[in-house]
């Protein structure tokens, strides 16, 4: 958290060891880091030292008596309802064809629940016997597992709509992840989905109330898939088989209390 102040106090270190090696730009003052970012960074360093110790590269373990790593803290996931997904899917965006394309991709992502990195790697070969099959990139190193997500009629309709208009073998006409996120915010605004949601500020850790259209992103599509499926089946093993969450995942556990109706059951 003190990195911005350290940058001001020791600028020569950042000049000697820049964050980006191949650049002629003057090092920028770092932004404050959130508690979750700091926690994850410490965990990676600890794993690296454990790896070195196991292989005999060093006996130095700076984490042996260090108790300050802590745990990540996340707010309750917010997502959009099935009705809101349908509203977005059916909204007239004919005045902005480029935005309409990204709307279709977002709706498709809501229907299969993958991460954006996996979505943009998909090709026509990813569709097998009426379902999307893929190995999540995030977990392929530790537990490679093929996920198979059946396609409903709307998802199949979206794929057929772009069957002859794509470049190469891409499943859909993707743009960069950042431009995709920007488009999603515009889509929510135009469709009138602007309700207030409660979120945790990742830097301060404080609770905030924000319009959902201002913070909507590709990951909201994944949360929407998980939240709506879990609301219907209430079986974490089935939902995990479709989303790729391993049994007992802390991230997946957060979805278990996100629906008011479920709390009344």
Regions found by a protein language model. Name each.
Residues 1-22:
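A Lys/Arg-rich helix-loop hairpin that forms a DNA/phosphate-binding surface
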Residues 19-43, 54, 58-116, 120, ...:
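Basic, Lys/Arg- and aromatic-enriched nucleic-acid-binding interface segment
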Residues 46-49, 53, 259-263:
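C-terminal flanking helix
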Residues 68, 112, 121-160:
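Conserved tyrosine-mediated DNA breakage-rejoining catalytic core shared by Y-recombinases
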Residues 88, 147-157, 161-162, 252-265:
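DNA/chromatin major-groove-contacting recognition/catalytic segments
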Residues 94-99, 165-170, 185-241, 245:
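Short, basic (Lys/Arg/His-rich) helix/loop patches that form interaction surfaces
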Residues 121-127, 230-232, 240-247, 254-258:
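A short, basic/aromatic helix-end/turn motif that makes direct DNA contacts
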């Amino acid at each position: 958290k003190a990195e911005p102040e350290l940058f001001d106090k020791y600028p020569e270190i950042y000049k000697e060891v820049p964050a980006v090696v191949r650049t002629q730009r003057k090092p920028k003052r770092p932004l404050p880091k959130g508690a979750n970012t700091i926690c994850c960074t410490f965990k990676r360093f600890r794993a690296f030292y454990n790896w070195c110790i196991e292989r005999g590269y060093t006996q130095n373990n700076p984490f042996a008596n260090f108790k300050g790593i802590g745990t990540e803290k996340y707010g309750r996931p917010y997502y959009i309802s099935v009705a809101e997904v349908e509203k977005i899917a059916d909204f007239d965006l004919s005045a902005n064809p480029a935005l309409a394309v990204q709307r279709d991709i977002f709706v498709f992502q809501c229907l299969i629940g993958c991460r954006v990195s996996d979505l943009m790697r998909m090709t026509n070969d990813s569709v097998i016997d009426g379902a999307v099959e893929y190995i999540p990139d995030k977990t392929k190193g530790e537990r490679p597992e093929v996920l198979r997500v059946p396609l409903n009629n709307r998802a199949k309709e979206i794929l057929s709509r772009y069957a002859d208009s794509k470049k190469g073998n891409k499943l859909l006409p993707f743009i960069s992840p950042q431009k995709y996120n920007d488009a999603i915010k515009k889509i929510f605004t135009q469709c009138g989905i602007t309700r207030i949601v409660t979120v945790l500020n990742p830097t301060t850790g404080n609770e905030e109330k924000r319009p959902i259209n201002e913070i909507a992103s590709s990951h909201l599509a994944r949360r929407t898939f998980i939240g709506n499926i879990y609301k219907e089946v209430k079986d974490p093993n089935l939902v995990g088989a479709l989303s790729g969450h391993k049994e007992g995942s802390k991230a997946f556990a957060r979805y278990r209390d996100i629906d008011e109706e479920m709390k009344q059951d």
